[in-house]
């Protein structure tokens, strides 16, 4: 067990966390910032990448890595951070030191809503709206802001997220059988499996992964967590969740639509 306190910088998620963004790149958790360098793609051995090694080495040796600024800021304000919450997660067998023990999957951006709190990397419908109206201004989609000088950069980004949403014939990473082979080969080590999106209930691969985990027997040692907008009812997916070690449904507020 890796014990985290306010007096150290250790983090279990730097060792056992695997959060895969909608674009297929990996990081230890959903809170971390990109920082310098390139995050490893799911197809790489993430734990051997320089990006991940430097993060792990810093946190293990008392250095507050700037990529973890969200946790540092929360802790400075006296608020429980995800890092500190790792102690409880370990006690409840929801994460351990194995690199695939805590898995957070965003299998693309397919969604059935366009909530105002969301952006194109996480909602295929927003991505389509932007792609269909690229001559409009879309503030906040680029760090520099949406100005004419950056229009070409914006168009490139809009096209990328339009493709990610599945609106073209181009094969996306979450459709690659090799990814699911890798996930299944590590299933015995998974203790938490979390799905966000997009909207997980409209993503076919989410249903397929959960069904496989149940049929293979791995669901018995996995805590399942899903973040949903709650618009889809009477799904086999909800019944499948009952076969996992524990289940948690996080409902997003629709007042922000």
What are these model-predicted stretches?
Residues 1-89:
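Accessory C-terminal segments flanking Radical SAM cores
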Residues 15, 29-31, 82-83, 115-119, ...:
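A short acidic (Asp/Glu
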Residues 15-23, 95-121, 191-194:
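N-terminal pre-triad scaffold of radical SAM enzymes
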Residues 27-33, 106-173:
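Canonical Radical SAM [4Fe-4S] cluster-binding loop centered on the CxxxCxxC motif
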Residues 77-102, 111-113, 134:
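Recognition helices and adjacent regulatory flanks at domain boundaries
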Residues 108, 125-136, 144, 163-181, ...:
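Canonical radical SAM enzyme core domain
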Residues 192-194, 223-225, 248-252:
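Structural preference for beta-strand elements that scaffold enzyme active sites
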Residues 255-257:
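Conserved small/polar residues in nucleotide/adenosyl-binding loops
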